[in-house]
């Protein structure tokens, strides 16, 4: 897998705790995917072998990424996901804002066993993402 950033690894103990507490690991939602490091961890360590992961991201970065070269970000995400996905797992992605992606997810009537909110880091956006996701 090809990652240029690691903003996730410090979360692994918390993710392991959550995975151990879950009764069902069939449907996961991730808001904010970037290169897919958390997505890949979920695919390899949490999600059932026949589970479904929905990733929502614009793949354009935000204010905090202004000085980063994001060329190829979406392609890198796709390649990382392809490498991490197990046989019968399904990975869907909505390449849009979290607001639009979550509105679409709500209309699909899926219920998620695990939701990871890591899109925009502004308080109003995080609150909106959390409320819409649950």
Language model features with spans:
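S-adenosylmethionine/decaboxylated-SAM
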Residues: 2-134
């Amino acid at each position: 897998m090809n990652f240029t950033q690691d903003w996730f690894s410090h979360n692994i103990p918390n993710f392991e705790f959550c995975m151990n507490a879950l009764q069902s690991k069939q449907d996961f939602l991730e808001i904010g995917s970037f290169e897919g490091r958390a997505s890949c961890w979920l695919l390899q360590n949490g999600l059932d072998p026949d589970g479904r992961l929905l990733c929502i991201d614009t793949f354009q970065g935000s204010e905090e990424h202004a000085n980063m070269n994001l060329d190829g970000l979406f392609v890198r995400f796709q390649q990382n996901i392809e490498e991490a996905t197990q046989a019968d797992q399904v990975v869907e992605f909505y390449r849009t804002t979290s607001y639009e992606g979550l509105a679409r997810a709500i209309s699909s009537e899926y219920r998620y066993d695990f939701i990871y909110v890591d899109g925009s880091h502004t308080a109003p956006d995080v609150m909106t993402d959390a409320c819409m996701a649950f």
